[in-house]
A protein has these predicted regions:
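C-terminal motif of bacterial Sec signal peptides marking the signal peptidase cleavage site
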Residues: 10-15
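Acidic, polar ligand-binding/catalytic clefts
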Residues: 65, 70-133, 202, 207
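Extended ligand-binding regions for polar small-molecule ligands
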Residues: 57-66, 132, 138, 143-145, ...
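A ligand-binding cleft/hinge motif common to bilobed small-molecule-binding domains
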Residues: 97-105, 152-153, 175-178, 182-209
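Ligand-binding clefts/hinges and TM-proximal coupling segments of bilobed small-molecule sensing domains
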Residues: 18-24, 70, 146-164, 196-205, ...
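Periplasmic-binding protein-like
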Residues: 38, 115-122, 188, 192-233, ...
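Extracytoplasmic small-molecule ligand-binding "clamshell" domains
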Residues: 24-96, 238
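Bilobed "Venus flytrap"/periplasmic-binding protein-like clamshell domains
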Residues: 39, 52-62, 119-167, 183, ...
Length: 249
């Protein structure tokens, strides 16, 4: 009886250990709650049907389909996304988010799925030709983005600039158009979209080091992280990823 009790206890603790181990690996939720900021075309935006669309959304919906999970999208300010994830209100952030050491302290990231850098938007008659020409100038940015960090002097070579922060990238562009700022610093793809949609503006390209977009995952949720990485790789191999690139970017 004593031996049986020891064996039973041993099995019980082994079972608990496996459950704890599984729990520590995280989980793949039946409904994946995806946070985004739909002000970043072509990666995320509100389309003509008033739906949140874009490359990131299409990729996450395809991943959800392959994992047999529903995908629920929550639109919010970019600067609020990581806080919402830390509060366990989001499973994934899909928002053209650049991987940085600071962000890694709060969230985990999937493998990178896109490489970009920062462009400068100026008026056509502007004398600005390179990033160092913005020293001491007024720069409009979307708050919390890499453009904000560059304008603030955290990256590359902008010094002593006055930084005007906006909740939406388009608002930063409108401020430039009306003469409230000298330039906008923003990621390459949305920069091209904004200039295409607004006469009287021009681009100054490739003005920063490369940056890498990835999906953010709740810290420690290795199961979901591995699952998304696996499906991203599969999508690249079977051509689905390239089809979405051609459709949106």
């Amino acid at each position: 009886v004593a031996l049986a009790g020891v064996l039973a206890a041993s099995m019980m603790f082994t079972g608990c250990s496996k459950k704890e181990e599984a729990k520590s690996e995280g989980e793949i939720p039946k409904t994946i709650v995806v946070g985004t900021n739909a002000e970043f075309p072509p990666f995320e935006y509100v389309n003509d049907d008033k739906e949140i669309d874009g490359f990131d959304m299409a990729v996450m919906k395809e991943i959800g389909k392959r994992l047999d999970c529903k995908v629920k999208i929550k639109n919010m300010e970019f600067k609020s996304l990581i806080g919402a994830m830390e509060s366990k209100n989001l499973d994934v952030i899909a928002a053209g988010m650049t991987v940085t050491d600071e962000r890694k302290e709060a969230v985990d990231f999937t493998d990178s799925y896109y490489t970009s850098n920062q462009y400068i938007i100026v008026k056509e008659d502007s004398k600005v030709k390179k990033i160092s020409d913005l020293d001491g100038k007024t720069i409009a940015v979307q708050e919390g983005t890499t453009g904000d960090l560059v304008a603030s002097g955290d990256y590359d070579s902008v010094k002593d600039a006055k930084v005007k922060r906006f909740k939406k990238g388009v608002d930063a562009v409108m401020d430039l158009k009306k003469g409230g700022s000298d330039a906008v610093i923003i990621d390459a793809n949305p920069a091209q979209e904004f200039v295409k949609a607004n006469e009287g503006l021009r681009l100054i390209k490739d003005q920063s080091s490369k940056e890498y977009y990835a999906f953010a995952i709740q810290k420690g949720n290795k199961k979901l992280q591995k699952a998304i990485n696996k499906e991203l790789e599969a999508m690249k191999k079977d051509g689905t990823f390239d089809k979405l690139i051609k459709k949106y970017i």
